[in-house]
Amino acid sequence: MSTQHARQFSRRRFLGGLTLVGTAGFLGLHPRPAPAEPPPETTTLRLVQGLGLCVAPQYVAEELLQAEGFLDVHSVKSNTVRDLEVPLASGDAHLGMHFAAPLVVRLDQADPIVILAGVHIGCFELFGTERVRAIRDLKGKTVAVPDLQTGPITFLASMVAYVGLDPRKDITWVTHPRAEAKQLLAEGKIDAFLGFPPDPQELRAKKIGHVVVNSAVDQPWSHYFCCLLAGNREFVRTHPVATKRAVRAILKAADVCALEPARVARFLVDKGYTPNYDYALQTMQEVPYDKWREYDPEDTVRFYALRLHEAGMIKSSPQKLIAQGTDWRFLNALKKELKR
């Protein structure tokens, strides 16, 4: 056995015996905060459970959150984007990962939430039939979305506005659940569908449609976060130490996703978050989880605010939304603390 192969084998065998929190420590992402940092104001944390596999850092953070002093971590389950947004605004959930464009819409609607950090880029992909080769080809076409007010339609409206189309006039929107929309795309009964993991992985595996836009590599979408971390405004105001500790755990978990995609994929299957290991592994390998230090989430809020304003979905200016709906204190501190 070569020395290099022996090193690789030893590392795999060693990592195989670690929990994910142990992996974080082994990779230099030690879960313990600085000794001088006070304990969290509460040991209970309620996280809204996001949609799709791309929110894996929130799942991986379970043990890291315990190490941060959270003894009682609850998941507030959501089946739709609306289910996700309501608990954050009401305070039934304290924190949670959510898609960037819908968050901007909620800020415009004066929801009492605050965006705290960017977590990753590149999770959504636009699939089309042969009639759609570029975003501009969506003019006059039929596009399926689960909701006409939030969720994928906010990203799609941003995309068509960016290329000069009017989503209110130029697109025929139809509402269908994700499973139905994928089947309609396969049958050619709709022209396009915006998918989030594991939908893109499934569509590619089944050779349904083709990729028109991949936000992990296609500009300008690859320059901006698709998933952000947000919190209930009152919780963040009254629990700053707990907020920082929770943000730290989730951002460290994003690093684990980037560094150990296979182990995270197995974790997601073993924990019941998804039944398909191959789709989970592809998601972990394809979504760039290592950009939270270098990309500026404020740029993301500004970009989507401008696009959604052009699309007629919001009224507020980017400056107002950034001033009232973002708080980068914790992220800025953690960028210094968690330097690579």
What are these regions (language model features)?
Residues 309-340:
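Conserved C-terminal helix/tail region of periplasmic/extracytoplasmic solute-binding proteins
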